[in-house]
């Protein structure tokens, strides 16, 4: 007699971690870490969204002073930042959750106002992000992205080291692992996408060369903290901030093939692969909506192709509803499903999805504001007493 297919609420073993359900908190920038230091507001935010056996991925966390591209995002490159994160991690662990830190460098998706000494942001290229897109500045206005400075080959190794040290700091803070942000038009994506990367050295041109930087990061971080604590997020078909590729399907397969080979070489699997699918689109301010970037059938086929190629845990993300999440898991198209905006407005999202209860609407106007409560920790949870 065949077993029933898994659901969003089935248990799952992710490497060494036993999860009680498959609903994941997606990483989301929230701009509440004043002066880049995790504070009590972040402690409460992540505590609210923690469940026994649940899995959380933090917002993008800066690996170095040059990696910033938003106001008041947290870092993990100073002792004070590490100490701040310890409180967040402790709160999540007390609720029984597993929590990973997303390591982030925005590359050219920055501005001189965020850079040490007012320097130009770094990238694979000198091509700026087009004026279709705008960057949120510290005074809450929006500006134009400046021309970046292409990294020299030897400087790339310095950034690899920044990732390695940040990963070590994350483990010191108590995190269960780290996610390398290689998606959404940020630094590592700027090297992988041929619509951005115009280099003629060993980091440009062929798929092999364009994947070199991200694989160096994965190898360095894996050597520092253990392969099964490392995961990677990619978005081959997402064109956020002009991050276009001429053949997203092949790019995704190229990254996956190399990750599979690396896992075999290291003798241990990565924690997971996290893929944002083309249902994710964005307006010029980087605020996302589920939209039709290709037909639903094309979207589904891309994800099926990548999922089928990857050896290991596969997380999907990007505009998922309860129904789409249930379908993805039941059909084997994903092991886990990450939810973003509705986790912002529903700290008890796991319970609401399980009960098929109504969801609080999110307030887009407070996504990137700095109030420690409003639009951050003040969304109501279900009255559990009334459910008994």
Curated annotation (Swiss-Prot):
The keyword Flavoprotein applies. Artemisinin and derivatives (e.g. artesunate), are antimalarial drugs due to their endoperoxidase properties; they also display multiple pharmacological actions against inflammation,viral infections, and cell and tumor proliferation. Artesunate may be a promising treatment for COVID-19 mediated by the severe acute respiratory syndrome coronavirus 2 (2019-nCoV) (SARS-CoV-2) because of its anti-inflammatory activity, NF-kappaB (nuclear factor kappa B)-coronavirus effect and chloroquine-like endocytosis inhibition mechanism. Expression at relatively high level in glandular trichomes, and at lower level in leaves and flower buds. Weakly expressed in roots. Expressed both in apical and sub-apical cells of glandular secretory trichomes. Also present in non-glandular trichome cells. This is Artemisinic aldehyde Delta(11(13)) reductase. GO terms for cellular component: cytosol; peroxisome. Signal peptide: none annotated. The lineage of its organism: Eukaryota, Viridiplantae, Streptophyta, Embryophyta, Tracheophyta. GO terms for molecular function: 12-oxophytodienoate reductase activity; FMN binding; oxidoreductase activity, acting on the CH-CH group of donors, NAD or NADP as acceptor. Optimum pH is 7.5. Its EC number is 1.3.1.92. One of its GO terms (biological process) is jasmonic acid biosynthetic process. Keywords: Cytoplasm, Flavoprotein, FMN, NADP, Oxidoreductase. It is found in: Cytoplasm, Cytosol. It catalyses: (11R)-dihydroartemisinic aldehyde + NADP(+) = (+)-artemisinic aldehyde + NADPH + H(+). It comes from the Eukaryota. Substrate binds at residues 181-184, 279, 368. It comes from Artemisia annua. Belongs to the NADH:flavin oxidoreductase/NADH oxidase family. InterPro entries: Aldolase_TIM (IPR013785), OxRdtase_FMN_N (IPR001155), Oye-like (IPR045247). Pathway: Sesquiterpene biosynthesis. FMN binds at residues 27-29, 60, 102, 181, 233, 317-319, 340-341. Its cofactor is FMN. A motif (Microbody targeting signal) lies at residues 386-388. Involved in the biosynthesis of the antimalarial endoperoxide artemisinin. Catalyzes the double bond reduction of artemisinic aldehyde to produce (11R)-dihydroartemisinic aldehyde. Also able to reduce 2-cyclohexen-1-one into cyclohexanone to a lesser extent. It is an enzyme of class 1 (oxidoreductase). SUPFAM superfamilies: FMN-linked oxidoreductases.
